[in-house]
């Protein structure tokens, strides 16, 4: 077998392994994100703070989080639909320590707001689990 063929086969296998690992990370991060969003959909705001990343918890108190999220989410009414629009991996984000992050954008529809964009940033936390580090809704 020619060396160029061996290199090409090795390269293709390396890409396949990297893609499988990326898909696995993406699935784990998305599952964690959707579980967390489910808490907010049910109005379990305090539990959503408890389940968030340590970076998130250090940035806002439980009481402030519950108050802020209640003010934003309650007027929207019940969730009607949520579709993943994009997922972007990052090692650095503005104002955050270097780490492993995935920024998800969801196209979401609520009872009282037909079209919203939810941005959820998850990070690999100290316990090596994907946890929400940021949430923004527009």
Which residues does each PLM region occupy?
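Second-shell loop/turn segments in exported
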Residues: 21-23, 34-37, 52-58, 107-109
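Exposed beta-sheet edge and beta->alpha loop/turn motif
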Residues: 87-138
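Short, low-complexity N-terminal intrinsically disordered segments enriched in polar/charged residues
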Residues: 2-4, 11, 16-44
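Short solvent-exposed beta->alpha transition segments
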Residues: 30-31, 46-99
């Amino acid at each position: 077998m020619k060396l160029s063929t061996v290199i090409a086969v090795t390269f293709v296998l390396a890409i396949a392994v990297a893609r499988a690992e990326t898909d696995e990370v993406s699935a784990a991060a998305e599952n964690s994100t959707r579980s967390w969003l489910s808490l907010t959909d049910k109005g379990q705001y305090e539990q959503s703070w408890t389940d968030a990343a340590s970076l998130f918890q250090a940035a806002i108190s439980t009481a402030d989080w519950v108050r802020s999220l209640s003010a934003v989410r309650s007027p929207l009414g019940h969730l009607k639909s949520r579709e993943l629009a994009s997922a972007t991996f990052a090692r650095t984000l503005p104002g955050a320590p270097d780490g492993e992050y995935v920024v998800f954008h969801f196209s979401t529809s609520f009872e009282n707001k037909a079209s919203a964009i939810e941005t959820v940033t998850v990070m690999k936390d100290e316990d090596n689990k994907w946890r929400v580090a940021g949430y923004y809704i527009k």
